[in-house]
Amino acid sequence: MTQMSDEQFRIFIETIKSLGPIKEEPPSKGSFSNCTVRFSGQRDHDAVDEFINAVETYKEVEGISDKDALKGLPLLFKSIAVVWWKGVRRDAKTWSDALQLLRDHFSPTKPSYQIYMEIFETKQSYDEVIDSFICKQRALLAKLPEGRHDEETELDFIYGLMQPKYRESIPRHEVKTFRELLDRGRTVERTRH
């Protein structure tokens, strides 16, 4: 085995550095120190998505680099999330790694059959407005694998779960998009109230 002197090692390292592309990250303009969003470690898909979306938006607006975001992420954790982070932080080499670890642990993907069960057991309640009902149902449909159903099929699912007052006033064959269904549903609400 060959050994290098300190001087040889220094020259070796400088040579390697000079051969590689210079990749400097732009200086970060901010940190998470003023971010008010917090995550407590609840195992809830929607809560995790909401947290990640808020943090990503804050990061972008404040110009926080991935490197600084990764360092500052623990500032946004409370409760069990703090304990969890202590155990996994070495596995998070990048910002993307950290977000994926967060999703994997606190927001495991539900199997499709469970999502379908949620969709079909949730009929529109009597006093629920059309906007709210369709929004909730579409959020559930969005959890299914990409491209599973076209809009026409998704409309069929949701139409069957709507209150009769909407179905009686809006023939299914007359609406081709969710936008049309919402517009027609709002008209029903204005004329029936």
From Swiss-Prot:
One cellular component term from this protein's GO annotations in UniProt: extracellular vesicle
Keywords, ordered alphabetically: Membrane, RNA-binding, Transport
Keyword Transport included in the entry's annotation: yes
InterPro entries: Ty3_capsid (IPR045358)
Subcellular location: Extracellular vesicle membrane
GO terms assigned for molecular function: identical protein binding; RNA binding; structural molecule activity
Pfam family, one: Ty3_capsid
Top-level lineage group: Eukaryota
Quaternary data: Homooligomer; homooligomerizes into virion-like capsids.
Task performed by this protein: Self-assembles into virion-like capsids that encapsulate RNAs and mediate intercellular RNA transfer. Arc2 protein is released from cells in extracellular vesicles that mediate the transfer of mRNA into neighboring cells.
Domain notes: The protein is evolutionarily related to retrotransposon Gag proteins. It contains structural elements found within viral Gag polyproteins originated from the Ty3/gypsy retrotransposon family and retains the ability to form virion-like capsid structures that can mediate mRNA transfer between cells. Tetrapod and fly Arc protein-coding genes originated independently from distinct lineages of Ty3/gypsy retrotransposons.
Similarity annotation: Belongs to the ARC/ARG3.1 family.
UniProt name for this protein: Activity-regulated cytoskeleton associated protein 2
Organism: Drosophila melanogaster (Fruit fly)
High-level lineage: Eukaryota, Metazoa, Ecdysozoa, Arthropoda, Hexapoda
